[in-house]
């Protein structure tokens, strides 16, 4: 196997942040000596998540076994996901910030699937995956991500399962969303349906899209972490993985 030097498009701040989390965790649990120190473990995890390199590739690059690599990654992802904001915390923060509205959007994390995995097949995206709900600010900064549900689950149903609609109403926060959320209630504003709309509805539709567009960039930010472009681990871990990446993305953005 050949080796080469490569750049990782992340700041040293993010590396230091994750290293600190791992260092404190090792001290708390009284871990014995490990092959990689906290900084090296943090770098390994960031390479895997950001670049999407396989366990075999990462393990070879850091000179450790595949099983150890997997344990290092799972440990870091679990610790990061615990720091992800809860829905009520995210909504309180949005309220304090005074955002005029939020943006709710669903995304699909692709997984390796076969014909027998029908519950994971998304008719909307025409592929197997896990449904994740994302709340973002008007400028596209992700605020909160949900757990994962099979890809066949409709966005509106997913929003109800995670209690998003009820919490938005309780917080009295207006939220913009696409047509997949028709019927979500008065606090979730969606575009008009149908082709032959009057001029007033067409104008409202265009204004809605203009406001919603920047907010939907939150999903693009999360999926800039290439591990989310096709998940090869257990699909049930998708939600935790996205929450961990949310924490890293917010750290990277400063």
PLM region spans:
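Short, flexible loop/turn motifs enriched in small residues
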Residues: 12, 39, 126-130
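Short, amphipathic alpha-helical "recognition" segments used to contact nucleic acids or chromatin
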Residues: 37-51
């Amino acid at each position: 196997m050949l080796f080469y030097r490569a750049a990782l498009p992340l700041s040293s701040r993010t590396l230091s942040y994750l290293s600190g989390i791992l260092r404190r965790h090792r001290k708390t649990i009284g871990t014995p000596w490990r092959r990689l120190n906290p900084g090296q473990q943090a770098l390994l995890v960031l390479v895997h998540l950001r670049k999407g390199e396989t366990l075999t590739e990462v393990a070879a690059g850091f000179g450790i076994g595949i099983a150890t690599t997997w344990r290092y990654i799972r440990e870091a992802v679990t610790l990061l996901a615990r720091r992800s904001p809860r829905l009520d915390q995210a909504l309180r923060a949005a309220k304090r910030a005074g955002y005029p509205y939020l943006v709710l959007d669903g995304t699909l994390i692709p997984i390796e699937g076969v014909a027998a995995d029908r519950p994971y097949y998304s008719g909307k995206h025409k592929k197997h995956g896990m449904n994740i709900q994302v709340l973002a600010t008007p400028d596209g900064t992700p605020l909160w991500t949900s757990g994962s549900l099979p890809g066949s689950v409709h966005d509106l149903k997913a929003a109800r399962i995670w209690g998003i609609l009820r919490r938005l109403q309780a917080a009295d926060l207006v939220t913009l969303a696409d047509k997949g959320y028709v019927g979500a209630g008065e606090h979730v504003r969606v575009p008009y349906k149908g082709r032959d709309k009057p001029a007033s509805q067409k104008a409202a539709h265009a204004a809605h899209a203009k406001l919603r567009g920047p907010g939907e960039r939150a999903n693009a930010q999360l999926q800039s972490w290439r591990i989310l472009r096709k998940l090869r681990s257990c699909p049930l871990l998708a939600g935790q993985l996205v929450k961990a990446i949310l924490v890293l993305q917010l750290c990277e953005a400063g």
